[in-house]
Swiss-Prot record:
Pfam families, per the entry: CortBP2
Signal peptide: none
Organism domain of life: Eukaryota
UniProt source species: Drosophila melanogaster (Fruit fly)
Note: Named 'Nausicaa' after the princess in Homer's 'The Odyssey' who helps to ensure Odysseus' safe passage home from Phaeacia.
Biased composition range(s): Pro residues: 563-574
Residues that bear Phosphoserine: 586
GO cellular component terms, A-Z: actin cytoskeleton; cytoplasm; FAR/SIN/STRIPAK complex; lamellipodium; stress fiber
Name of the protein in question: CTTNBP2 N-terminal-like protein
Keywords: Cell projection, Coiled coil, Cytoplasm, Cytoskeleton, Phosphoprotein
């Protein structure tokens, strides 16, 4: 190691003289000398240039110490103590050998330079000597005066150059001495650092022994922890293996379910296609049904319009029937009043007749006693009594009703209120519109009139109890002709009194109404009227024709509209009706009859009294 360091230093000095100064300067830059330290330049070569020693100030450098500390820290942490001590010894030996080599080379170089200056022997390769020779050659011969002067001047110039070179050499020597001082300081500091490092290493050794003693316990605890962690690791591995098995099973189950779901999806897709096809078919069918429904709705609207017309017609007929019923009720009241008057008159006539009979009996007895001379007068008196006892003839009280409305009813199934109802063929009710009887002189005074009044009352009651309507106009009036009984002015004279009997005019055939065929529901108003008329004919024959006010109904022809289907979506609601006049008339009629009966009874009792 010493030979290598010496050879490297020798090569450096041989290459360039100025390199030593640079090298010394670089080494000085790494020194740790403090500011203000002075180094004396007293040396054995001080005699070369007299004068006081040069004092040099060395600048401190902290980077080297910090880098050395960092390096030592890394080495301390990486290498053992014995190796570090051995390396420190090697470093000290190398540094000492380097210092010896540097001092020897420096002395040798200084001796060579001083010897050259003293002997003035210049080397051929010296640039200054070459310049001097060139100058002499240019100036001429040395013998001449001018050349001698020029030679003297050249010599002076050479001396100046030599002095400059000497000055440079002195400066270089002073720099080398300062470098030497710096290196000595660096070595001193390095020795101090080495001693400090040894102390730290000893302390670290003691600490390491203590740490090792404590580390045994820690190692034992760590060993226990390691065993525990190994057991936990084995358990975790077993659990991981178990979880892997479970995962494999789950993957198999997942694959099975995936295939199953795929099949289900395919089946659902096929089912969806079928449903879509069925949906399309049902859509077409619904469109057809909607079209049919629209047609049926249009047809039902047409039928509803017809039903509305029929309803209006039936309502008009009902109004007319109510008017007719009201008129008949008024007529019934008038007839009851006339009946009461006639009953009073009949009672008066009966009383007079009884009185006349008693007188006649008395006269007859007187005539029998008087003789047969008065036979003619007795015969006349008997004839008068027979004629007087006879009832006055009944007049024609028949009411000729001229119908004004015809109903073309169409059999339609629907609401029953206010709308004509249909019946099956063959259920036509034929009733006699007019009950006829042979005309002639009546034999009873009260019975025909009572029968007519009873018949009228039956018709009125039946009309009040029914709710259907018919269209008819009431025309004409009932003429009641009272038979005037001629009473002789003087019964005592026994004159023949003749009472002419006026035959009532029979109704003309032109005014008689034919029987009407009524196409209505069984149990209706007209059926009740016909039944009442038939019962009246069978029980009490009328001497005069009594027509029933039944309006004829025209039967629809064979080519009329047929029966439409029922209308489930649009039922016709009949309008709300006010209380009919027939109901009000029935109430007022019954009250009027009761009043007339009471008045008749009161008058009869008053006369008897």
């Amino acid at each position: 190691m010493e030979q290598n360091s010496n050879s490297s230093v020798a090569d450096t000095f041989a290459e360039a003289p100025a390199t030593d100064a640079d090298y010394g300067t670089e080494n000085c830059s790494g020194s740790g000398m403090s500011v203000g330290d002075t180094v004396s330049a007293n040396h054995e070569f001080q005699t070369m240039k007299p004068g006081p020693g040069v004092v040099h100030k060395v600048m401190p450098v902290a980077n080297s110490a910090s880098s050395a500390t960092a390096t030592n820290g890394r080495t301390r942490s990486e290498m053992p103590h014995s190796e570090l001590v051995k390396m420190l010894y090697y470093l000290e030996g190398e540094l000492q050998a380097r210092d010896v080599c540097i001092a020897a080379l420096r002395n040798e170089r200084v001796k060579q330079l001083i010897a050259q200056l003293r002997t003035k022997r210049l080397q051929p390769n010296d640039p200054y000597a070459a310049i001097f020779r060139d100058k002499i050659a240019l100036n001429g011969n040395l013998i001449s005066r001018e050349s001698s002067t020029q030679a003297a001047q050249a010599e002076m110039e050479v001396r100046q150059i030599i002095e400059q070179q000497m000055e440079q050499q002195y400066q270089m020597v002073s720099k080398q001495r300062a470098t030497h001082v710096r290196m000595v300081n660096i070595l001193t500091e390095s020795l101090e650092n080495n001693q400090r490092m040894l102390q730290e290493l000893e302390e670290e050794k003691r600490k390491h022994e203590n740490t090792t003693a404590q580390g045994d316990d820690i190692t034992y605890g760590l060993e226990l922890e390691r065993n525990k962690l190994k057991q936990d690791l084995e358990e975790e591995r077993a659990q991981v293996a178990k979880m892997e098995k479970d995962l494999k099973k789950l993957q198999e189950t997942l694959e099975y379910e995936r295939n199953r779901q795929k099949q289900i999806v395919l089946l659902l897709i096929a089912e969806r296609k079928k449903i879509l096809m069925k949906y399309i078919e049902e859509g077409k069918r619904s469109e057809d049904l909607a079209q049919i429904l629209a047609e049926e709705k249009q047809r039902s609207d047409t039928i509803a319009e017809g039903l509305e017309e029929e309803s209006k017609k039936s309502l008009r007929m009902e109004e007319e029937l109510e008017k007719q019923t009201h008129a008949m009720e008024q007529e019934r009241k008038v007839l009851f009043a006339k009946l009461a008057k006639e009953e009073l008159r009949v009672k008066e006539l009966e009383q007079e007749l009884n009185a006349l009979r008693s007188e006649h009996e008395a006269l007859k007895k007187q005539q029998q006693l008087g003789g047969s001379g008065s036979s003619v007068a007795a015969a006349k008196a008997r004839q008068f009594s027979d004629d007087a006892c006879a009832t006055p003839p009944m007049v024609n009280i028949a009411k000729i009703v001229q119908p004004t409305a015809t109903v073309s009813s169409m059999p339609v199934s629907g609401p029953q209120t206010g709308i004509a109802r249909s019946i099956a063929p063959g259920q036509n009710i034929r009733s006699a519109g007019i009950a006829t009887a042979p005309t002639g002189t009546a034999t009873a005074a009260i019975a025909p009139l009572t029968a007519v009044l009873n018949h009228t009352t039956t018709i009125t009651t039946t009309t009040n109890n029914t709710t259907t309507s018919s269209n008819s106009n009431s025309s004409g009036s009932i003429g009641v002709a009272a038979t005037a009984a001629a009473v002789a002015a003087s019964v005592e004279t026994a004159a023949t009194v003749t009472v002419p009997m006026v035959a009532p005019p029979s109704p003309s055939p032109a005014k008689m109404q034919p029987t009407a065929t009524i196409q209505r529901a069984p149990g209706g108003k007209y059926a009740a009227l016909a039944a009442a008329a038939a019962l009246d004919q069978t029980t009490t024959p009328h001497p005069h024709p009594v027509p029933i006010a039944v309006p004829p109904v025209t039967v629809p022809p064979a080519g009329a509209r047929g029966a439409p289907p029922p209308i489930p979506t649009k039922p016709i609601v009949p309008p709300k009706r006010e209380p009919s006049l027939s109901r009000l008339g029935s109430i007022t009629g019954s009250s009027a009859i009761a009043a007339a009966t009471a008045a008749t009874t009161a008058a009869g009792t008053a006369k008897q009294n």
